[in-house]
Amino acid sequence: NRIMTEATRKKIVMWFWILFTTPIVLVIGLLASVWAFADIPSFEELENPDSKLATEVISSDGEILTTFHIENRSFVTYEELSEHLVNAAIATEDSRFYKHSGIDFESLARVLVKTLLAGDSSQGGGSTITQQLAKTLYPRETVNSKFKMVWIKLKEWITAVKRERNYTKEEIMNMYMNQIFFGSNAYGIKAASQTFFGKNPVDLTVEEAATLVGMVNKPTRYNPAINPDKSLTRRNFVISRMEQNGFLTKAECDSIQQIPITLSYQIQDHNAGIAPYFRDMLRRTMMAKEPK
């Protein structure tokens, strides 16, 4: 009886601590989750991101005289994108773009197997275009622990799924193209098109679109004005991916890969454009303090 009594007492103590600590652990976990995900943007914030768009000075006939900006970024609509840009981005960055809902588990599994078992890292990180767009909301420069990185990755996944539920694929692609940094003070595809080729995104050829898309993940390494040889190799890789994904025929691929990269390179700044005296006077007027 004494042994039974002692065993019963231990069970009572054990269940007491379980019942006592479980709510505390749950509350702590809930508070930690609220803290960890507190900065996940709302739908309104996703709808109206702080993109630091440039102020464009436009003449009466519709010509852009100059821009004033912190980041050289101008918005374009989906209809203003060359189809070659969209095709190149899908072929290179997210071949299953129209088949997943923000996270492509099939691609993640493939990348994991090839990276760990075959040692092949050429498949990239398995991030979808929607995930890459979400990454711009969570800077990683100051992250110095694996634990924080896991939290950030989880928040990126949640944000990516949230975007997929609220936007069409075309809207997501448009956001992506407007958000990418291409180096050379070019933020977004419009600034990049004008900086490197002196034209609007809708007018880009296949080889020009492939050059810009090739810069997405490493804008300095594959900058055609800085590293023309590396840029050409990368551009031709993008073109080959377009052929593999059915956007180009084999003959088109082989022909386009022979075309050299021809730039119309000009970094866009406040001094670029026509009517310099008018622009300077306008800048002074805009920056002048309102009299008290």
Each predicted region: which residue ranges?
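N-terminal type II signal-anchor transmembrane helix
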Residues: 2-58, 96, 116
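Generic detector of well-ordered alpha-helical segments enriched in charged/polar residues
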Residues: 44-47, 62, 109, 113, ...
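Generic surface-pattern signal
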Residues: 37, 48, 117-118, 139, ...
